[in-house]
């Protein structure tokens, strides 16, 4: 069969208008790009994404780094859970505005990543976020996700759709069983899924903490890597913890992470409070850095403890006299 000839078209970079990357959640989820959230089955990927969607449906950020100005429309496609008995109850528990969360009806025909209904739905609903859960359910009949050429074409088309409408697209993927391999190669199927995504997040259980899950960025082509995050899953439900000290190697290898630096920062503050009612901000920051605690982690500990700043002369101080040590 003769290969179809394509007319040559040249793009001059002088004709391209420069644009800045827009972020749904900096530096984890960009608008107009593909993001993969992957992890082992049962480790909380879907729970994380449903709670993210619930917050966004009300114009609220899940994390303090998430700048959300208004409620947004979201398309959530799942091939693993029932809408009535699983998805809707979980959204209600997460206090979602279900008017803002929509699903493409697949009762007559299953959806695929290149289905024209995806574009139609984004246009019709003005969705800013599209979620496909899981990746392998939306390949289409006869498609082999382990064949690089097939997955590359499919994900490229999906990426162009995200770019065209400035819509963030999240693909949820299960990890394979290749323990010890790099996270990129443990993702289900072809490495091309990983290659096309601009950001990849790994969700997993933290060794020694049965209720805590970590979120670690293992790929970012658009900015510096983000700080690892964590959340808890208990009988009371989902609880976002924010910054957490753990690496991808620790998470994948089942290694107990070093003591949480935020807890170490709190302990440092408690110790200072025993002998000081106020301490110069600069002195606390320097002392923390000597102990391997970043300024950001220290500020998070300060916020959680409700510590207020006080200006004395030309310098800022932390008021430690009202801290109640647990």
Language-model segment annotations:
Residues 1-10, 123-126, 164-165, 207-326:
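C-terminal regions of RecA-like/P-loop NTPase motor modules
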Residues 2-4, 19-20, 24-26, 41-43, ...:
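Conserved inter-motif catalytic segment of the P-loop NTP-binding fold
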Residues 31-35, 72:
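Pre-Walker A (Motif I) flank of P-loop NTPase domains
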Residues 36-37, 42, 47, 69, ...:
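Phosphate-binding/switch region of NTP-binding enzymes
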Residues 48, 52:
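Hydrophobic positions on the alpha1 helix immediately C-terminal to the Walker A/P-loop
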Residues 57:
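Gly/Ala-rich phosphate-binding loop of Rossmann-like dinucleotide-binding domains
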Residues 100-102, 199, 308:
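Conserved beta-strand segments of alpha/beta enzyme cores
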């Amino acid at each position: 069969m003769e290969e179809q000839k394509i007319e040559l078209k040249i793009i001059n970079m002088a004709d391209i208008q420069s644009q800045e990357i827009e972020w749904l959640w900096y530096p984890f989820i960009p608008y107009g790009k593909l993001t993969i959230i992957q992890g082992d089955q049962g480790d909380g990927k879907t729970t994380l994404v449903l709670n993210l969607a619930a917050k966004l449906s009300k114009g609220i950020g899940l994390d303090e780094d998430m700048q959300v100005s208004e409620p947004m429309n979201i398309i959530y496609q799942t091939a693993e859970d029932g809408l009535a008995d699983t998805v809707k109850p979980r959204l209600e528990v997460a206090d979602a505005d279900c008017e803002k969360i929509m699903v493409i009806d697949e009762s007559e025909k299953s959806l695929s990543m290149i289905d024209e209904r995806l574009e139609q739905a984004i246009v019709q609903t003005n969705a800013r976020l599209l979620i496909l859960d899981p990746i392998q359910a939306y390949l289409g009949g006869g498609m082999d996700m382990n064949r690089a050429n097939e997955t590359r074409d499919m994900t490229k088309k999906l990426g162009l759709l995200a770019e065209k409408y400035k819509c963030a697209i999240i693909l949820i993927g299960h990890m394979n069983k290749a323990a010890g391999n790099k996270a990129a190669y443990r993702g289900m199927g072809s490495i091309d899924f990983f290659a096309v995504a601009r950001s990849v997040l790994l969700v997993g259980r933290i060794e020694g903490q049965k209720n805590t899950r970590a979120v670690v960025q293992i790929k970012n082509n658009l900015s510096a890597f983000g700080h690892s995050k964590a959340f808890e899953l208990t009988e009371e439900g989902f609880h976002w913890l924010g910054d957490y000290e753990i690496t991808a190697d620790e998470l994948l290898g089942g290694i107990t992470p070093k003591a949480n630096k935020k807890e170490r920062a709190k302990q440092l503050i408690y110790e200072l409070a025993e002998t000081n009612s106020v301490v110069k901000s600069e002195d606390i920051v320097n002392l923390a850095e000597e102990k391997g605690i970043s300024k950001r982690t220290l500020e998070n500990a300060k916020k959680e403890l409700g510590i207020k700043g006080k200006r004395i002369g030309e310098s800022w101080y932390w008021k430690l006299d009202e801290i109640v040590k647990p």
